[in-house]
Regions:
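Active-site loop segments of alpha/beta catalytic cores
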Residues: 1-31, 109-347
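Active-site-flanking structural segment that lines cofactor/substrate pockets
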Residues: 29-61
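Pocket-flanking alpha-helical
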Residues: 33, 77-80, 127
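Intrinsic-disorder/low-complexity, polar/charged segments
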Residues: 45-48, 97-102, 114, 166, ...
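Generic internal hydrophobic packing segments that stabilize the cores of diverse globular domains
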Residues: 51-55, 63, 117-124
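Glycine-rich, N-terminal phosphate-binding loop and its surrounding beta-alpha-beta segment
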Residues: 53-81
Length: 347
C-alpha cells in the first residue's frame, strides 16, 4: 500500500500493513525550513512556498500525510481579523474584530477568494500534483468555538459563554458556515481528510460546556464536511472523550496529557486515534531509546496513527521526527529501505 492509502485506511480503522505515521497539525521546524529553503512568514502567504514546505513532511520527514495550513489564523484573516504573520521563529497572531458577541457577524461573500483562504486552497492543489497520489493530502479548518476566540477575543467570548450563552450559540451558528465553506473548498482543491481544530481544552472549556455548546456542532460538521474529519483538541481531554466519541468524527488527534492507554479505552472501538507523542519529551528532547519506548507504547495499545501530539515546536530538531518515522516503520513491520534508522538530534 502507498503511504497515503495506509494513512486513510487507519483513519477508518481498517487493516493496513503497518501503523499510520503522520500529523493533523504543523510539523514545521526552523531547521526544516532551512533544509528546504522556505521560511515563515512567506510560507503562510505564498501558495508555492506553502506547498514546498508542507511537502517536506513527506520528502524529508517521511510522514504518510502532508498538511499545508501551518497557522491558526487563515480563515480569521479572510473574515477580516488583523493578523501579524510573524517570522521564521514566531507564530502568527491576530486581533479580534468585534467587541461583543451581540455584534452582527458579517461573513464576506468573497471569503474563499481572500488571501487567507485562497493561498492554502491553491497550495492544496499544488500538493496533490507534487505528491502524485503517494501520500494523503490533509487540510485544516477551525471550529466555531475557536473562531469565536479569534473574532471576539478569548476573554470576551468565554465570559459571554457564561453570561450570554444564547448569544454565543447564535454566533457559533453563523461561524459554523465559515468552517464548512472553507473545509469543503479544501476538499474540492484536493484535501482527502480535514483537520478540525477547536481549542476547547480543559482550561478554556469544561466538559459540560463541550457537551452543551460543541457536541451538536461537531456532529453537524461531521455530516456536512465531505471527507474524513480529524478532531484536534490540545490538553487533557479525558473528561470529554465520552462526548467526542458521540460526534461520529473519524479520528481524534490527542495530546500526551492523556495516556495512550486511557485515550484508547475512552475512545472505544470506532474512533481512530492519532498522535499522543510529547512535543517536549520526545520531539524536542528525545533519544533513540525514548522514541522507541514511546512508539512501542502507542502500538501496544492500538493507536492508529503515531506522531506528534500537536503543532511541533519551531525549535525542535527535525531529525527527531525522522527518527520517529523510521522507528515506527521498523516496529510495525515496514523497516526503512536502508535498514538504517536515522539518528536523533544530539544536544
Amino acid at each position: 500500500m502507498r503511504p497515503g492509502d495506509i494513512f486513510l485506511a487507519k483513519l477508518a480503522r481498517k487493516p493496513a500493513p503497518r501503523c499510520g505515521i503522520g500529523s493533523a497539525t504543523s510539523v514545521v521546524t526552523t531547521d526544516l525550513m532551512d533544509a528546504v529553503q522556505v521560511a515563515f512568514p512567506h510560507a503562510h502567504l505564498d501558495a508555492e512556498s506553502m506547498a514546498r514546505l508542507a511537502a517536506a513532511g513527506h520528502t524529508v520527514l517521511g510522514f504518510d500525510n502532508v498538511m499545508p495550513l501551518f497557522s491558526v489564523w487563515h480563515e480569521s484573516a479572510a473574515m477580516g481579523c488583523e493578523v501579524d504573520w510573524g517570522g521564521k521563529n514566531q507564530w502568527p497572531n491576530g486581533q479580534p474584530m468585534y467587541s461583543s458577541v451581540d455584534d452582527a457577524i458579517l461573513v464576506p461573500p468573497d471569503l474563499l477568494k481572500r488571501p487567507g483562504c485562497a493561498v492554502p486552497l491553491k497550495a492544496l492543489g499544488l500538493l496533490q500534483q507534487m505528491m502524485n497520489g503517494q501520500v494523503a493530502v490533509v487540510g485544516k479548518v477551525f471550529g466555531p468555538w475557536t473562531l469565536g476566540y479569534h473574532v471576539f477575543g478569548i476573554e470576551a467570548f468565554l465570559m459571554a459563554s457564561l453570561l450570554e450563552p444564547d448569544a454565543v450559540k447564535r454566533a457559533m451558528r453563523k461561524l459554523i458556515e465559515v468552517t464548512v465553506a472553507f473545509a469543503n473548498a479544501q476538499i474540492d482543491c484536493g484535501a482527502e481528510a480535514i483537520t478540525l481544530a477547536d481549542h476547547c481544552t480543559r482550561d478554556l472549556c469544561s466538559p459540560e460546556t463541550y457537551r452543551d455548546f460543541l457536541l451538536e456542532i461537531h456532529q453537524e460538521l461531521q455530516q456536512r464536511i465531505r471527507c474524513p474529519v480529524i478532531l484536534h483538541i490540545c490538553g487533557n481531554t479525558a473528561d470529554r472523550l465520552q462526548y467526542i466519541r458521540e460526534t461520529g468524527l473519524a479520528c481524534f488527534h490527542f495530546d500526551s496529557k492523556v495516556s495512550a492507554a486511557e485515550a484508547r479505552r475512552l475512545a472505544g472501538e470506532k474512533l481512530a486515534l492519532m498522535g499522543g507523542t510529547s512535543n517536549f519529551d520526545i520531539v524536542r528532547n528525545g533519544t533513540l531509546e525514548s522514541i522507541e519506548k514511546d512508539i512501542v507504547e502507542k502500538l501496544n495499545v492500538g493507536i492508529d496513527i503515531v506522531g506528534p501530539e500537536c503543532a511541533v515546536p519551531l525549535d525542535a530538531p527535525y531529525k527527531n521526527l525522522r527518527t520517529l518515522v523510521d522507528v515506527a516503520k521498523k516496529l510495525s513491520g515496514d523497516p526503512p529501505a536502508t535498514d538504517q534508522i536515522s539518528k536523533p538530534h544530539e544536544t
